Curated annotation (Swiss-Prot):
It comes from Mycobacterium tuberculosis (strain ATCC 25618 / H37Rv). The active site is at E184. Disruption phenotype: Deletion mutant is attenuated for growth and virulence in mice. Deletion of the gene alters the NADH/NAD(+) ratio, suggesting that this enzyme has an important function in maintaining the redox status of the cell. Mutant shows growth defects in vitro and is more susceptible to oxidative stress reagents, but not to potential NADH dehydrogenase inhibitors. Was considered as an essential gene in vitro, but later studies show that ndh is not essential individually. It is found in: Cell inner membrane. Alternative, nonproton pumping NADH:quinone oxidoreductase that delivers electrons to the respiratory chain by oxidation of NADH and reduction of quinones. Ndh is probably the main NADH dehydrogenase of M.tuberculosis. This is Type II NADH:quinone oxidoreductase Ndh. The keyword Amino-acid biosynthesis does not apply. Keywords: Cell inner membrane, Cell membrane, FAD, Flavoprotein, Membrane, NAD, Oxidoreductase, Transmembrane, Transmembrane helix. Disulfide bonds: none annotated.
Length: 463
């Protein structure tokens, strides 16, 4: 009888954690699990971690996109329990505990034991998605580069235009939404026109450009209170920004915006360059979760999670960041970071034997909110204390530097800020032809051709 071989014991499989998204929530969850006995797969649509609060500075030429978007796999390269995967998550199979993603026509299935959904949010046009073609939002590097191209291209086209009406339209910049992003964007476009580009053109005067900030609300920066909102508005007006409140946008096209004022008046603003910062809409994955579970969504599509950030019936599935609707937690970076760390700590504790039924609820610590208005001027609210002006700007600068990833990134960003804030010069004003004409390239070229034909006809008649 031949000897029987003893069966070899298979090594126990490690707990599998899948993270969807590489933003503040996804990245911080992965880093918090660095020393945990888990295998992590982080799936994201982009190859970088985006520091979204500074996107407006990419759009206005202050810093480069590389300074706020380090490659995710480079950030996590020393964390051996993480695998970074590029792909667009199309479905979460709750019953089968599997995430389905696609990349260049190929479909992949990634099983999980614990799932952290941190897919973020996109721009909301409140049911008018066709506005996006004419008024890009600011949620990605592509958005910021497109806006930079549109802003600088408007000045370039105005320099070549012989039509006063078209020139006025090109030099009118409209920002929709008077929240932090809108305030920061309007302020930087105004400074770009007033200081950086001053004297750079021969046919136009960049300082004559109009910057309009629109909002349906009755105040600027509503979440920060009336006092700080008024101070921000006063600073913007000093820069020459026209603030129009109680103004609801009803239509957007290539040539401008239609607005309905609070008194019912409907009017038109001719503006070639529009920026949309009026609202956000959570990832469609929230709807995917709702269709398979008892979880409900709010009006913005956010998942109404339980106090432990899990979803009803699935204690191993967590939602954090902009996708999660949690009372008292704003849709800002700190909410995503703190939520992600809480979930990672929960997973580690339960792997060590903690009872899932005894989870402590997530507690958010409000570290304050802030917005820059212009060089050396910002507004900030930390607890009950309010700051404005230079002190608030210093607080803003220090905190944003602290949260940037990597020593080299911090240094290069600080150098870019130093050059811009002390000299008004900006080092990132190069645009490509694709960025300049962006999504409306064919229409813009047709308009230029029509104007050229009109000028030629006029010259022929005159001769």
């Amino acid at each position: 009888m031949s000897p029987q071989q003893e069966p070899t014991a298979q090594p126990p499989r490690r707990h599998r954690v899948v993270i969807i998204g590489s933003g503040f929530g996804g990245l911080n969850a992965a880093k918090k699990l660095k020393r945990a006995d888990v295998d992590i797969k982080l799936i994201a649509r982009t190859t970088h971690h985006l520091f979204q609060p500074l996107l407006y500075q990419v759009a206005t030429g202050i810093i480069s996109e590389g300074e706020i978007a380090p490659p995710t796999r480079v950030v996590l390269r020393k964390q051996r329990n993480v695998q970074v995967l590029l792909g667009n998550v199309t479905h979460i199979d709750l019953a089968g505990q599997c995430v389905v993603s696609e990349l260049l026509g190929h479909t992949y299935q990634t099983p999980y034991d614990s799932l952290i959904v941190a897919a973020g949010a996109g721009q909301s046009y409140f049911g008018n998605d066709h506005f996006a073609e004419f008024a890009p939002g600011m949620k990605s590097i592509d958005d910021a580069l497109e806006l930079r191209g549109r802003i600088l291209s408007a000045f370039e086209q105005a320099e070549r235009s012989s039509d006063p009406e078209r020139r006025a339209k090109l030099l009118t910049f409209t920002v929709v939404g008077a929240g932090p992003t809108g305030v920061e964007m309007a302020g930087q476009i105004a400074e770009l026109a007033e200081h950086t580009l001053k004297g750079a053109f021969r046919h136009i005067d960049s300082t004559k450009a109009r910057v309009i900030l629109l909002d349906a609300a009755p105040a600027v920066l509503p979440p920060m209170g009336a006092k700080l909102g008024q101070r921000a508005a006063a600073r913007l007006q000093k820069l020459g920004v026209e603030i129009q409140l109680g103004a609801m946008v009803t239509d957007v096209d290539r040539n401008g915006i239609t607005v309905k004022d609070s008194d019912g008046t409907v009017r038109r603003i001719e503006s070639a360059c529009k920026v949309w910062s009026a609202g956000v809409s959570a990832s469609r994955l929230g709807r995917d979760l709702a269709e398979q579970s008892r979880v409900e969504l709010d009006r913005a599509g956010r998942v109404q999670v339980l106090p432990d950030l899990s979803i009803p019936g699935y204690p191993n599935v967590f939602v954090v960041g902009d996708m999660a609707a949690v009372e008292g937690v704003p849709g800002v970076a700190q909410g995503a970071i703190q939520g992600a760390k809480y979930v990672a700590s929960t997973i580690k504790a339960e792997l060590a034997g903690a009872n899932p039924a005894e989870r402590e609820p997530f507690q958010y610590f409000d570290k304050g909110s802030m917005a820059t208005v212009s060089r050396f001027s910002a507004v900030a609210k930390i607890g009950p204390v309010e700051f404005s002006g230079f002190i608030a700007w210093l607080i803003w600068l220090v905190l944003h530097l602290a949260y940037l990833i990597g020593f080299k990134t911090k240094i290069t960003t600080l150098l870019s800020w130093t050059v811009t804030f002390l000299s008004t010069r900006r080092g990132q004003l190069t645009i490509t032809d694709q960025q300049a004409f962006a999504r409306t390239r064919l229409e813009q070229l047709a308009e230029l051709a029509a104007e050229a034909q009109g000028s030629a006809a006029s010259a022929k008649v005159a001769s």
